[in-house]
UniProtKB/Swiss-Prot annotation:
This enzyme offers a promising route for the synthesis of chiral enol-lactones, when expressed in an engineered strain deprived of enone reductase activity. The lineage of its organism: Bacteria, Pseudomonadati, Pseudomonadota, Alphaproteobacteria, Hyphomicrobiales. Catalyzes a Baeyer-Villiger oxidation reaction, i.e. the insertion of an oxygen atom into a carbon-carbon bond adjacent to a carbonyl, which converts ketones to esters or lactones using NADPH as an electron donor. Besides cycloalkanones, can use cyclic alpha,beta-unsaturated ketones as substrates, leading to enol-lactones. Can also act on methylated cycloalkanones and methylated cycloalkenones with high enantioselectivity in some cases. It holds the Pfam family FMO-like. This is Baeyer-Villiger monooxygenase.
């Protein structure tokens, strides 16, 4: 610890002390708060937003909705699901907010949450084995354990476009949408980016905008959502199966209740293969992505069969052949499914409308933003509203944006300059008593949020209970365990097609960010590794 840091730490001897300070009030954070309180720990949660919900507080743009179906995208706690009913198979942001309010009321969470508290810095007090945590408003607290539940999409990425601040119209990033809303009606709207939020904004803006221009770099291989309304009677009948559904989601690759076909796509006759693809297509959601054959994400030839089926189904919906070549090209831009597919309802049909146009920025790059709109190499696109659907500094950005100092004064950002280094996707050496959930080198982006919140969350709760029962005040991952974890992750990644795409899974969407697989492929294998380490007295950690 530096002398300046040590002096600052000593000045906060009178700060309130907690067993655990949690950052973030999404699924992970509130599950941790609930469970640690149940086990008798003194806990406080800091949330930067004015309400709970995590990403569903910040993502309130028109059309924003979850891509995991119901009942997978909710807690498995019977006290919660027994009396709650959804209105849609894939709920929108406002219904998800109502769900979080319901959870809050049921579990009495808000009394231990402080909203509007953005954590700006934290340093480890080696003399006391405590973290000293600071917020932007000057609040300082101490905690034995610093638990970061910032999610994988909490730091919006805004490209460094020349002249961006000069734009005279309205300009918003989808992850920072104004809480009071913004209207597309009668406006010339430009959307930069065609990931999940871009797809959803395009669908909504296409209905009301005077003209909509979509700036696309790489075509999104979007899947049909197959959205539908849900009634109370149907859900009440379904609830008899909820315990089994929640059991299954703990045992599948992505934490869903979707089982894959264990055969190779190449050993199945073409007619039978297409029949399965059609069945998955009609089910909607992620069924087509993760319910197919066992080698779709590991064998390029097998993968191509899935892309070709997707391409043919999608091109049939696009009237203009030239647009079809841009949106669903004959040759895949990357292997199917190695970028997280977005779910759509009428995305491709939107491009059949006279008020919607597409700009391929690989052919006509954005030169700069000017007061009147977007200047490309082909000329000016005049706009009244510019929407940046440009994603996030995913998985690591929410952690490294906090000025976190570990032992010896090194910051987390400095340590991860050449790439994230963790053990079990929970901890990193040099930062004792700091644990993160849904973060780097855990399933995170591959996993349904509530599934990970509960499975990772229980591991953390058990770890803290173990330390309390054995009078241990400090836990730290070893550098050797980190290295072995990286080797395991790299070996698994090398067996897949994921490194073949420039995706946020690989950190490739952020200029200068080290390229590495940021997510552990598969919940069951991951949890087996975590539980094995715990059973061996937390092998790979040093407990004092």
């Amino acid at each position: 610890m530096s002398s300046v840091q040590s002096s600052q730490t000593q000045k906060n001897d009178d700060a309130e002390v907690f067993d655990a300070l949690i950052v973030g009030a999404g699924f992970n954070g509130i599950y941790q708060l609930h469970r640690l309180r149940q086990e008798g720990f003194k806990v406080r949660l800091f949330e930067a937003g004015a309400d709970m919900g995590g990403i569903w507080y910040w993502n309130c743009y028109p059309g924003a909705r979850v891509d995991s179906h119901i009942p997978i995208y909710e807690f498995s706690i019977e006290e919660l699901w027994r009396d709650w009913n959804w209105t849609e198979r894939f709920p929108a942001w406002d219904e998800l907010r109502r769900y979080f309010h319901y959870v809050d009321k049921k579990l009495d969470l808000s009394r231990d949450i402080r909203f509007g508290m953005r954590v700006s810095a934290a340093e480890f007090d080696e003399a006391r084995d405590q973290w000293v945590i600071r917020t932007t408003d000057g609040t300082v607290v101490r905690a034995r354990f610093f638990i970061l539940c910032t999610g994988f999409a909490s730091k919006p990425y805004i490209p460094n476009y020349k002249g961006l601040e000069s734009f005279a119209g309205e300009s918003f990033h989808t992850g920072l949408w104004p809480q009071e809303g913004a209207s597309f009606t009668g406006k010339r709207v430009g959307v930069v980016g065609t990931g999940a939020s871009g797809v959803q904004v395009v669908q909504e803006a296409s209905k009301d905008a005077a003209h909509l221009t979509v700036f696309q770099r790489t075509p999104i291989l979007a899947l049909p959502m197959q959205q539908r309304k849900l009634d109370v009677e149907t859900q009440q009948r379904m609830k008899a199966d909820y315990p089994e559904i929640f059991r299954i989601r703990r045992e599948t690759f992505g934490g869903f209740d979707i089982l894959r076909d264990e055969r190779s796509a190449l050993e199945v006759p073409p007619e039978e293969r297409c029949a399965l693809y059609e069945k998955l297509w009609q089910k909607g959601g992620f069924h087509y992505w993760i319910g197919g054959f066992s080698d779709i994400l590991t064998n390029e030839e097998a993968n191509r069969t899935m892309y070709d089926f997707w391409r043919d189904k999608t091109r049939a919906r696009i009237k203009n052949p030239a647009l079809a070549d841009k949106l669903a090209p004959m040759e895949p831009p990357h292997p199917f499914g190695v970028k997280r597919p977005s779910l759509e309802q009428w995305y491709y049909e939107a491009f059949n409308q006279d008020n919607v146009s597409l700009v391929d920025v690989r052919e006509m790059p954005i030169v700069e933003i000017v007061p009147e709109g977007v200047l490309t190499s082909d000329g000016l696109v005049e706009l009244d509203m510019l929407v940046l659907a440009t994603g996030f500094d995913a998985v690591t950005g929410g952690l490294t944006q906090i000025d976190i100092h570990g032992t010896g004064g090194i910051t987390l950002k400095e340590k991860w300059t050449e790439g994230a280094r963790t053990y079990l996707g929970f901890a990193t050496s040099g930062f004792p008593n700091m644990l993160f959930l849904y973060g780097p080198q855990s399933p995170s982006g591959f996993c349904n949020g509530p599934t990970c919140a509960e499975m990772q969350g229980e591991w953390v709760v058990d770890c803290l209970k173990h330390m309390r029962e054995n009078n241990k005040g400090r836990i730290e991952a070893t550098a050797q365990a980190e290295e072995e974890w990286a080797q395991l992750l790299n070996s698994i990644a090398g067996m897949t097609l994921f490194p073949r795409a420039d995706s946020w899974y690989m950190g490739a969407n952020i200029p200068g960010k080290p390229r590495q697989l940021l997510n552990f492929p598969g919940v069951p294998i991951y949890m087996d590794q975590c539980n094995t380490a715990a059973a061996k007295d937390y092998e790979g950690f040093v407990l004092d």
